[in-house]
Regions:
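C-terminal substrate-binding subdomain of Rossmann-fold SDR/epimerase-dehydratase oxidoreductases
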Residues: 201-339
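Pocket-edge positions in alpha/beta enzyme catalytic cores
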Residues: 57, 69, 96, 192-196, ...
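Short-chain dehydrogenase/reductase
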Residues: 97, 146-154, 190, 194-198, ...
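Short, basic/glycine-rich phosphate-binding loops at helix/coil junctions
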Residues: 182-184, 221-222
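N-terminal Rossmann-like NAD(P)+-binding domain of SDR-like oxidoreductases, especially those catalyzing
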Residues: 1-183
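Catalytic core of nucleotidyl cyclases, primarily class III adenylyl/guanylyl cyclases
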Residues: 186-188
């Protein structure tokens, strides 16, 4: 089986490529390297001992996609490519809608014309409405998103759902991620954000190593046990395994399916800081900063459907997540730039 992975040089994409290659699948990656590095692909090959085929291009390049589908016998697609910073999306909404929505439409058009009918879409817990009770189920209310990034994921989900109605021979799996952290246990690949991190774990690890002076904790007056925001953190390798499980399911089940990929347990920002310090015997200085607009007090998944239908559940512990994040950071203090 050959899998086309858009955004395969990125954080989640590269770890998923490792899992796909180790399961014996062939992998073709398309990535424009706007927020990723080709070094990730070289290290994926180093980890697995297997090659991947890489096309550097934007997924919105229809002629480029036609070339890929002509040159490679693609069986299914995992669509990671897109802009992904929640805060930045509020400052650059047009770019986010153009990139995330546009790439999805162009990709589906190319798939349709080349007879490829199986796609896994990299969605997000941000599609859920902010007024849901916890935990979040696949049937919880969506829409009423709190930022443009979430809306782009919501719109892309709807595009794919509408297309399955128009052509029921398609298999579409929407995977709603919660908060991926951690890195491959080898320390060879991990999360390498450009500029100041948007996600908590690279912010913690870059502060611990001295690349950043202090961690900003956005708000300590939420209705949570310690006043800081609670999220469902999941090891990126668990997330990668979820995609392999979804490929197997998708091959036998046409139509649309939705699955949460989370642990079902939430941790606060301060709990994460203390867990990281304990796991790695380091100090993480932090300061309390004002709340960020759109941040919810508590978000965590109910992953029962994924366990029941996909046979998937998170296996890595919080200590594993913290340890692997730190291993990546210490092996690559400046990310892939040190290569």
């Amino acid at each position: 089986m050959t899998v086309l992975v858009t955004g395969g040089m990125g954080y989640i994409g590269s770890h998923t490529c490792v899992e796909l290659l180790e399961q014996g699948m062939d992998v073709v990656v398309v990535d424009n390297l706007v927020n990723s590095s080709a070094e990730a692909g070289r290290r994926v090959e180093q980890i697995t001992g297997r090659p991947l085929k890489f096309y550097q291009m934007d997924v919105r390049d229809r002629a480029g996609l036609d070339r890929i589908f002509t040159e490679q016998k693609i069986d299914c697609v995992i669509h990671f490519a897109g802009l992904k910073a929640v805060g930045e999306s509020g400052q650059m909404p047009l770019e986010y809608y153009d990139n995330n929505r546009g790439s999805t439409i162009t990709l589906c058009e190319a798939m349709r014309d080349h007879g490829v009918r199986q796609i896994i879409f990299s969605s997000s817990a941000t599609v859920y409405s902010g007024d849901n009770e916890m935990p979040l189920y696949e049937t919880s209310r969506t829409g009423n998103c709190t930022n443009p990034y979430g809306w782009t994921k919501y719109v892309c989900e709807q595009i794919l759902r509408d297309y399955v109605v128009a052509d029921p021979s398609w298999s579409v799996v929407l995977l709603r991620y919660f908060n991926p952290i951690g890195a491959h246990p080898s320390g060879l690949i991990g999360e390498d954000p450009r500029g100041v991190p948007n996600n908590l774990m690279p912010y913690i690890s870059q502060t611990a190593i001295g690349r950043l002076k202090c961690l900003s904790v956005f708000g300590d007056d939420y209705d949570t046990p310690d006043g800081t925001g609670v999220r469902d953190y999941i090891h990126v390798m668990d997330l990668a395994r979820g995609h392999v499980a979804a490929i197997a399911y998708m091959a036998e089940h046409p139509g649309e399916s939705i699955f949460n990929l989370g642990t079902g347990k939430g941790y606060s920002v301060l709990e994460m800081v203390h867990a990281f310090e304990t796991a790695n015997h380091v100090h993480v200085p932090y300061r309390i900063a004002p709340r960020r607009a759109g941040d919810l007090p508590t978000v965590y998944a109910c992953p029962d459907k994924s366990a029941r239908i996909l046979g998937w559940h998170a296996e890595y512990s919080l200590e594993d997540m913290c340890r692997d994040s730190w291993h990546w950071q210490t092996q690559n203090p400046n990310g892939y730039e040190t290569a």
